[in-house]
Amino acid sequence: MAPSRKRGGGRAAAASSARREWKVGDLVLAKVKGFPAWPAVVDEPEKWGHSADSKKVTVHFFGTQQIAFCNHGDVESFTEEKKQSLLTRRHAKGSDFVRAVKEITESYEKLKQQDQASGPKYAEETTAGSSGNTSQLPQACENLIGSRLDTQIESSSSHGRDELTLLSEDASAAEQMLALRHNTLAHNGACDSAAAKDLCEIATYSSRRRNERVRALKYAPQSIILPVEHSKISSRLELDRVQRSMLQCSDGGPSVNSINGKAIRRRKRIRTSGQSESDDVVSSDLNLHGSDEDNASEIATVESNNNSRNEGNGVDSGSKVEYSDAVGEGCDGGHELNKGLDFHISTMVKRKKRKPTRKRETSDIIDPPAKVEAEGLGPNACDSCQRSQNSHERLNERPCEENGDEHLPLVKRARVRMSRAFYADEKVNASSQVEERSSKDTLLSAALQTSPSVNHENGIGSGHDTSAAEEFNSFELSAKLSGVMVDVVPSHMEKPSDRMSPSVACVQTVGDRQTAVNFHENEFTMTLDDEVTRAQSNQLSSLVETEARVPEVVQGCSEESQTGNCLISETDPIDIQCSHQSEKHETPLNPDIVDSSANKSPGLCSSLDMTTTVVPAQSPHQHKIQEYDSSDHSLVIVGDSLNGKCEKIDYCMTQVVQSQALEPPPPLFCSVVNYQEVENLQETENTLWKENQGSPGKELDSDKQAHMIQNPVLSATESEMIVDDAEPQYETVYSHCADAVENRELEKSCEVDEQKEQMQATNSISVSENFSREKLNSSPARGTPNCNSVCRISTAESENAMQNNSYYSTNVQYGENKSLNVDTVKEESKVETGTTQVKKVVSSDVQCTVESFETALDSLVRTKETIGRATRLAMDLAKFGVSAKAMEILAHTLESESNLQRRVDLFFLVDSIAQCSKGLNGDAGGVYLSSIQAMLPRLLTAAVPAGATTQENRKQCLKVLRLWLERRILPESIVRHHIRELDSLSNVPACLYSRRSARTERALDDPVRDMEGILVDEYGSNSTLQLHGFCIPPILRDEDEGSDSDGGDFESVTPEHESRSLEEHVTPSITERHTRILEDVDGELEMEDVAPPWEGGSSASAITDQADNRESANCLLVPGTSHQNVTSSSPPARPSQNAQLAMSNSYSNGFDYRRNPSMQGDYHAGPPRMNPPMHYGSPEPSYSSRVSLSKSMPRGEGSNFQHRPYPSSHPPPPPPSHHYSYMEPDHHIKSRREGLSYPHRSHYTLEFDERNYQDSYERMRPEPCENRDNWRYHPPSSHGPRYHDRHKGPHQSSSYSGHHRDSGRLQNNRWSDSPRAYNNRHSYHYKQHSEGPVPVGMRDPGTWHQR
């Protein structure tokens, strides 16, 4: 027999076969126990402080910040099939898994694109580029340019072209440019480097063009600059670029080497950075273009340090970032700047095609300014932008240096980088942030200044183009915003070529500030029609659009001047805003500003910082000034202050003006712009509002547009930068920062109390959200920077700040919408997320999580799965910093829920969240606990509303609170307080409820506690529920059946036996319930029939009569009738029934047998019938009342005495049939059951103690009956039997005429006064003043055994 194979050998073989050499960065699916195969990336264990293990694969999971060391068999490669599989089943796995799938899918697509870009085509290009001759480089450049032009034209003409092909073309072009640069570096060809720069620009713009195709119409002016929509524009653009490149080649600079080296590094980064790099690029590009969806594929901005996400960086757009890099690299000279710019553009590589599902609002305006900057950025702008570029490069470099977190999910990566960026290069961040915020007005002036300065410094070629394009964009945007746009539109449409010509003119008139301004106006006019209409229609809101455009203008102008410096562009927008304000207020102010900005462009960076600081400082004044010009300034203000309010907008304008006034001394570009602007603005500050109201329409409109353009730029990248570096910006800025912060805070306090809380960071976040809300929310890449800002907030646990930010941004959008309703409508239609985005200024992940949480609340049921899922979503929201919002949603849902049971379910969810939070460490655990503690009264009020129908809810909530008390979820004092409140609500009077209080709910000293099984109430009976039975016995006729058989065996029952039998029959029939009560009378057990005579008393009465008949063997009046008749006729009674009947009899016959020897004889004749006595209402009176009846009875008569009428003036009637003779037992029982009237009741009524036997009926009522007292004491008049004939009514003072019932009962009891109807069957031996009733044995007729 072959040896059995070792179990598990197959597994080992599979593992060994699956083992492979994983490389760092490989995308895999890693299986960990308890989790599905999770998307992950192979990582280096050394990076995490672990040693390498060949048996384990170190993976870093997407969607989390966790790593694991998995066996080779648990790791499988991520393929296209796996991707499809994950996409189909990701939704049921939780938000983390969905995010992980999304991230790995994006990374996978990016890697595919990179592979395509680095394929054989790239190798060929590299080989061709590496040819030894430098002279080949220009030709190659020309070829590339031609091919790129063709490609651009083709792409513009065929929008449906495969996106992957476009990506590959762009990537190949970029690689070619890199190779060309490399060759040039080897051959030291300056012209070649210039050509490479142009090629890079072409490649970048071509990819951008594709990205912008969707929004090309919006950016007609920009499309002129960049080949986006029309082949003509593209061709012109390319030709212009070629010309510039040729000029640059002639100017040729030796900086190509450095550029090439950087290009090589960047290219390497592009290939190795992985998803984070691509994401960063995408985010920057998205910021530039406004949305990933529209761009299907994004250009990856591969800066030396910007590979990763451009979070804290001032990368509002890919082109802008590129320029800042280029400037940083080529700031040594104009040629270097151009080359660096080109190189940076070449580093731009399309990474991936974004999912259209990612909803992002595209700010097309942003892209054109960036493109304009890219084209127009000339070497001239290099010097002026160096400072800001350096800071910007540092910002960009920071993410690259921090690439170690590329494996993290977008949100978490953004959080990490935000934290790093927050502490690193705070000055740079602050500058960029401030620039972005205050760059609205400054942007126009900065653009004008930058372009002239670029022209002067760098040369007519690229410098003019850049300045012209920038100015053109600024004017275009301004015109778009203003009504002048209409005028400009026809000219723009008519002269598409004029677009380029204005730039040429601008180049020619490099030194002419007015020429540049005019050029900008011309360009604006030319492009106004397409760009204004499309941009406005596509912008989220008019104000948002204006803001976006203003930042774009800032980017275009400032980027031209600062090129690679997002900070500069941000700062420039501030200056531009100031100049625009001046322009709006004063027409001549624009040219002056342009001149000053052009002259002072070199100081752009520092000026930006100054301007940034100054803007806040000036905000109060400007705010006042701009209140009048809210429509124009509101656009600018929104971008600057980020507050999202018209007041803030005004404040921003004021800030711009003031900042200019404060900053005239600094020589930097901003200060230069501010210099003349300050002079003009200072003058205009007083007249600003007047001029704003009545300033030249075109200029004001242009200013508005410029401001709007600036705002969009801020929304894309500046907003992100602001969010990340809002606080550092103020710190970074000069001493003005403090003033700016203070001013900003003051403005916030005036404008919004919430803004006070958020302060600078809040403002920056608001701006980014306001301008790029849709973009950031919709685009994953852009979302990352936004997430960074948001994450920072969440990391700081400023949930209120986030909410305030969203509120502000919403306000900003609303304010902007108010200023431009039409634009707002278009914006809303464009915004896919719509109301959700307006309500939530958070990342798309946070928004999705909030929506999922709301859905989970709607579908919540009392199951572990649904409550656990909602709890996990709540924990996710706490990670995002919106736990307060989650609790508010939960409380609102709880309050609005109409189903009481679902309210308990929701409160159980609160319990789940609280317990889950208790298990968390750090601040995350205390967030929800503090919220729950604060909202607990509200939650309990909603879960347990007032009313008797919420007892179940109250019990469940008490259980939860006691559990919290036991586990110390919340402070003990608070929990106990709420428990006491709920307990007090539980102690509702019993009268409100139909049921009797449970045994455990009664007081310890309550005698009824011991009688739980007897079904009696505080008054000795349970007749409360069957009160009608006394008056209408037929109702219980059927129920009484079976009780008549109680007359069978009359076996005397001891208290122990009786109680035991009663316990065995806890639920006797209704009649029995009413007929027996146990009362405690002086420690003795006494039976008393308290039930209505006709319903419950029928059976008991039969037994009683039988017993009485036994006792009354010597019945004088009715000798013929004996208990034997009854006994024989009636079936034997069950022991329990007998016991109960005996009890009732003992109660009814509660006479002091000690005084009645005959009764004693009866008692001894049979076993004593005793039950555990039970107080009937007030026990003493009831017992005394019973005993009182016997006071007038002769003792010596024994049973005969019992049957004798009670001594009274009216002796009982002689006829035995009427008096004491029993009817035939059947008849007797039947008559009693049927409640037949007894004609001779009156006979007994007179002799019996005539305390209304209705009182005994009354005893059945809930309130304590004092009729028992009447039983003891004879009332002066008799009102008839206590239990009257059912047919005759409850109160009959006539004779007790039920000879059936009465005869049997009165044979034993012989009362002249009719006893209680049901008591008649029991022999009542009353003594006048017996001290208490005594149990009576009714088995032995005629004898009482006295104790």
Swiss-Prot record:
Disruption phenotype: No visible phenotype under normal growth conditions, but the triple mutant plants hulk1, hulk2 and hulk3 show delayed flowering. Gene3D superfamilies: 1.25.40.90, 2.30.30.140. It holds the Pfam family PWWP. InterPro entries: CID_dom (IPR006569), ENTH_VHS (IPR008942), PWWP_dom (IPR000313). Its main location: nucleus. Residues 110-137, 251-320, 383-402, 1037-1069, 1121-1140, 1147-1223, 1259-1347 are annotated as: Disordered. This is Protein HUA2-LIKE 3. It comes from Arabidopsis thaliana.
